[in-house]
Regions:
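Asp-box/BNR beta-propeller blade signature and adjacent active/binding-site loops
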Residues: 1-169
């Protein structure tokens, strides 16, 4: 999975390093249903690693992780099946071991493409998140940066970075 690792800054899992990952198992399946999103984590600076549970989305891959408030972790992933043209999110309250509140975020349209998620600061006790992707449901277009000040519940700030409406490129 392209992306970055996250080191927890507070809470019970402070210091834990979490690396978002994905895998496929067995023979390739129709619509990439063999893809699964998960992660690896270490509590001893890389001497040993453990693998998390899979996110409950067949075809989930290219996920990104970031710490949100109360020491929780958010995964934001690509839906390789493409049946829902939006990003999929999952939350963890146990340091990235297991997942809850798993759902499509229809406020984050996606054409089945890698996206990026980072924590870029803090505001009123919550992490400020930045999410960037091709915010289009049919093609890799409309590169958009979105900002959330409430742990990714809402993305009120949206900046169109680039749009190619010329179909010849």
């Amino acid at each position: 999975t392209p992306g970055h690792a996250v080191q927890f800054e507070k809470g019970k899992y402070k210091g834990r390093i979490y690396i978002a990952a994905n895998h496929s198992a067995g023979d390739p399946q129709k619509e990439s249903m063999d893809y699964k999103a998960h992660g690896f984590y270490t509590d001893d600076h890389g001497k040993t690693f453990h693998i998390s549970n899979n996110v409950n989305l067949e075809g989930g891959n290219e996920n990104m992780a970031t710490e949100i408030s109360k020491g929780r972790l958010m995964l934001n992933l690509r839906n390789q099946q493409g049946h829902t043209k939006a990003r999929y999110t999952a939350l963890s309250s146990d340091g990235g071991v297991s997942w809850h509140n798993q759902q499509f975020d229809n406020n984050l349209p996606d054409p089945v493409c890698q996206g990026s998620l980072l924590t870029i600061g803090k505001s009123r006790g919550k992490n400020v998140l930045a999410f960037c992707n091709a915010a289009d449901t049919s093609q890799r277009n409309h590169l958009t940066l979105r900002i959330s000040r409430d742990d990714g519940k809402n993305w009120k700030k949206s900046i169109l970075v680039y749009s190619n409406n010329d179909k010849q490129d």
